Amino acid sequence: VDRFCVRYHGKAFLLDAKTPILTLGRDLACKLVIEDRKASRKHGRIEKRGDDYYLVDMSTNGSFVSRSGQPEVMVRHQEILLGGSGRICFGSSSNDPMADCADFEHL
């Protein structure tokens, strides 16, 4: 079974064929509610396309994506393939000790 897991502040969110989209943002209507003020109300979403999962960023300050073994990439109003495992930081780089981040893994 093709699944994708996002972990944020002790909560786990699973994506698969039945749940192909995870909305991210400070807005309480989002499935994953981000606490950091640097995140946008509707920051973005993770969506399943075929066997792949993409982060679609719609934020003001961007998302900083670190995939295993690769340098961090800043994404703003763009999308990026989330392969393997890694980390998404909302509105600031993972180099910032105050960064608010979620970990992801393609299962």
Predicted features along the sequence, with ranges:
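Short beta-strand/loop motifs in extracellular/secreted proteins, especially
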Residues: D2, K42, S63
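Secondary-structure transition/turn motif
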Residues: H9, D57-T60
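General beta-strand recognition
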Residues: C5, L14, T23, V33, ...
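A short beta-strand micro-motif
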Residues: D2-Y8
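Short, charged beta-strand/loop "edge" motif centered at a coil->beta-strand transition
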Residues: T19-G50, N95
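Generic detection of short hydrophobic beta-strand segments and adjacent strand-loop junctions
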Residues: F13-A17, L32-I34, I80-L82
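C-terminal boundary/linker segments immediately following FHA domains
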Residues: S59-T60, V65-L107
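Glycine-centered tight beta-turn/hairpin loop motif at sheet-sheet or coil-to-beta transitions
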Residues: Y8-G10, N95
